[in-house]
Amino acid sequence: MTRKLVLLRHGQSQWNLDNRFTGWVDVDLTEQGRREAAAAGRLMREEGLQFDVAHTSVLKRAIHTLQGALAELEQDWLPVNKSWRLNERHYGGLQGLDKAETAAKHGEDQVKVWRRSYDIPPPAMDLEDPGHPIHDRRYAGLDRNALPGTESLATTLDRVLPYWHDAIAPQLKDGKTVLVTAHGNSLRALYKYLNNVSREEILELNIPTGIPLLFELNDDLTVKSFRYLGDPEAARKAAEAVANQGKAK
């Protein structure tokens, strides 16, 4: 039996548009982002996907993308699980900074390492910073030592994997069709795990906003196939645009 999993990065957010590092800052979608969410729903509807359950983060750009896609699918009733473990990678002291200006200051190579390397985190956010998640009431029930002040992709994967094993994988093994709407780096982490991508290869992986990535999985959840829905060239160009965000103007 083939299991189906869709990974969907949220639509364009205001800070995607502004080319700023977002991380755990709770920025909403732009109008373009809302259109992308609806378009993702149409692509999934055209594919004939009937989901049993959905998962998302606790950040509204992902939540609103999921809501927009489910409305287009006419599956608004779907059970939805929200978890901080699906949040975007925490960008530490870079959060809120303009990516191009940061590249001009520190060099494109350094910014690429911070954005796309596997195990090198950006400079950490100070615990006293009001933007640190220990001061956010949505995380009040969590061990403050589990809340990051910065993350690499490796530590993001360490955060995401327990949720995969405890919540998502059992549903897939039960034969459920699952939709995960999350963020560029939490989805890169899942992609790396599912496809056993090397540390070197993951540096070049960019996930576009608002384009569903369909995985077909075997019974043991190894990957049988995966592809973006819709026009492959559109997905390629969108991923290329993501890669260019970290370049100086």
UniProtKB/Swiss-Prot annotation:
- Gene3D superfamilies in alphabetical order: Phosphoglycerate mutase-like
Please name the top-level EC class of this enzyme: isomerase
The reaction(s) annotated as catalysed by this protein in its Swiss-Prot or TrEMBL entry are:
(2R)-2-phosphoglycerate = (2R)-3-phosphoglycerate
Q: Name one GO biological process term.
A: glycolytic process
Q: Does the keyword Isomerase apply?
A: yes
**Summary of the function given for this chain in its UniProt record:** Catalyzes the interconversion of 2-phosphoglycerate and 3-phosphoglycerate.
What PANTHER family does UniProt report for this protein, alphabetically? PHOSPHOGLYCERATE MUTASE (PTHR11931)
Put simply, this protein is called: 2,3-bisphosphoglycerate-dependent phosphoglycerate mutase
Supply the source organism for this entry.
Stenotrophomonas maltophilia (strain R551-3)
Q: What is the lineage of its organism?
A: Bacteria, Pseudomonadati, Pseudomonadota, Gammaproteobacteria, Lysobacterales
